[in-house]
Design a protein with these regions (language model features):
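Mixed-charge, Lys/Arg-enriched low-complexity segments
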Residues: 61-117
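Generic cytosolic/nucleocytoplasmic N-terminal low-complexity/intrinsically disordered segments
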Residues: 1, 43, 49, 110-112
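A short, sequence-level motif marking secondary-structure junctions
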Residues: 9-16, 37-46, 69-77
Length: 117
């Protein structure tokens, strides 16, 4: 069961405790290179201006963003964004947890319902 784009974006916007590091690849990439995205609000006790980050993309050394939306819409994966390439995204881990685990999807959805209430 694949998490929807909307649910993953929601998780990055509202339940940041579980997205410090997320691994994925694109199934239309013959090399299947892994990419990383995440959220780190502080470094050495200092609040960071751009807590959202991407590693292993078109920009050497990765890049940082103020919002999750900016991260998901950044055209840094062969000139396209995660949003544009979503149908080819294969999530491996979300916050260190197996992205395919049924319990993980239930947790995401239950957290979303709780936060929305």
């Amino acid at each position: 069961m694949k998490i929807s784009y909307e649910d993953l974006l929601y998780l990055f916007e509202h339940d940041r405790d579980h997205v410090d590091e997320t691994r994925f690849y694109f199934d239309d990439d013959p090399e299947e290179d892994e990419h990383y995205i995440g959220y780190i609000p502080e470094v050495k006790g200092e609040i960071v201006d751009k807590p959202y980050w991407i590693g292993y993309c078109d920009i050497d050394g990765g890049c940082e963003f103020k919002t999750a939306k900016e991260l998901f819409e950044a055209k840094v994966f062969n000139g396209k964004s995660i949003k544009e390439r979503w149908e080819h995204v294969i999530l491996l881990e979300i916050g260190g947890y197996d992205a395919d685990a049924e319990s993980w999807h239930e947790k995401i959805l239950s957290n979303r319902k709780r936060i929305d209430e």
